[in-house]
Amino acid sequence: GCIPYGKTCEFWSGPWCCAGKCKLNVWSMTLSCTRNF
C-alpha cells in the first residue's frame, strides 16, 4: 500500500506517499506526507 497524507514516512524505504512527497514537518520535527506533488 501507500502512506496517506499527514502520516509519517521515510525517504529511504517504502511504502511511499500515496500523493505528494515525504517532507519534514517543522512544527512536529517528523517526516510526513505532503498534500501536493
From Swiss-Prot:
GO terms for cellular component: extracellular region. GO terms for molecular function: sodium channel regulator activity; toxin activity. Contains 3 disulfide bonds. The modification Phenylalanine amide is found at residue 37. Expressed by the venom gland. Blocks the Nav1.2/SCN2A, Nav1.4/SCN4A, and Nav1.6/SCN8A sodium channels. Reduces the peak amplitude of the sodium current and negatively shifts the steady-state inactivation process. Does not shift the threshold potential of activation or the voltage corresponding to maximal current. Does not change the reversal potential of the sodium current. May act on site 1 of the receptor. Belongs to the neurotoxin 01 (U2-agtx) family. The presence of a 'disulfide through disulfide knot' structurally defines this protein as a knottin. This is Mu-thomitoxin-Hme1a. It comes from Heriaeus mellotteei. The lineage of its organism: Eukaryota, Metazoa, Ecdysozoa, Arthropoda, Chelicerata.
